[in-house]
Amino acid sequence: MRTFNLFRKEGDGSHLDDSERSWHRSRMIALCVNRRVAPQRVLQHGGDESYVSASPLSAVALGASLYLPATRPDLMMIANSQKLPGLRSVIFCTEDAVSGRDLERALDNLAALLPKLETGPLLRFIRPRNPTVLWRLLQLDGIERVQGFALPKFGPHTLGDWLRVWDDSKGHRLLPILETAEVFDHRKMEIMRDRLEDYGLKARIVCLRIGGNDLLNLLGIRRRRGATIYDTPLRGAIADLVRVFNPAGYRLSAPVFDYLDTPEVLIREVEADLQHGLVGKTAIHPAQIPVIESCYRVPREDYETAAAILAPDAAAVFKLRDSFCEPATHRRWAEGVLERARVFGVVAGPSDDH
């Protein structure tokens, strides 16, 4: 079995060659999805009306988010897209990926990095270890150059701690991580949803991230090789979170996939993520990113169906390709499909080969 160590910290930076090779190799792995992407073009959904994303920083735009320990010596090159240039979003971690003895080094690394961050398409977030570390990060020069923060162990019992240090004036967005035992309590999740609304945080939240490994740890479980997260007890918890948060307008992103040598299982899991209404996924290695994002490409049939549903002159009920379409009940699905198509493209169908 091959092993990859994303968290190696050699000082000369040459170790990224392996990651870069894996990055390009993984583009070949992604071909096992057996899909071809249609040429890029302006997306339309009726007449000459173009579909426009509701927000330039959306849960969909994050794609596969790569976690990196903030102790890495090559953080600057990745943050400024000199390494892994195809990356859509990155989260610099000062929590689980950094030992307590290395925390100050991680913060020093970020303090040196932030003023030198260049403008570009890469979406950059920081995962603070705790509210105290968040407060320290907010004092750093250049902190306004990151898009926001992924808040770990987020729940009703920690919400007040985060809010006490939160500075809303800098325009940062939030990625709260749901990974405590409270996730298994339906009522507590409803309470937290209501508190987010009461405190006016909803507009700041890009998505709520599901911390799969922390939740499995609470159950004393690690998924076996070949299993998706939906083959574990978390299937019910994920469905419950979707039922609590999605109707209120929040988006949920999917947990990490632990294995690097079973891309076919990763593909199966991402397809199940989408079926459960999840958007985006955390990646533990660059090799996973093209595999994950290949699954986000929209099948042409779905794209054309979504465009027809959102057309201004769409009938109240109609049939398309032997499927029942009702704009009043399918609108949110259709909007999500066109958002994915805008970001990741449309998968060509058989008719496009002629």
Residue ranges and their predicted role:
Residues 2-354:
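Expand to "…catalyze enediolate/carbanion chemistry for C-C bond making/breaking, isomerization
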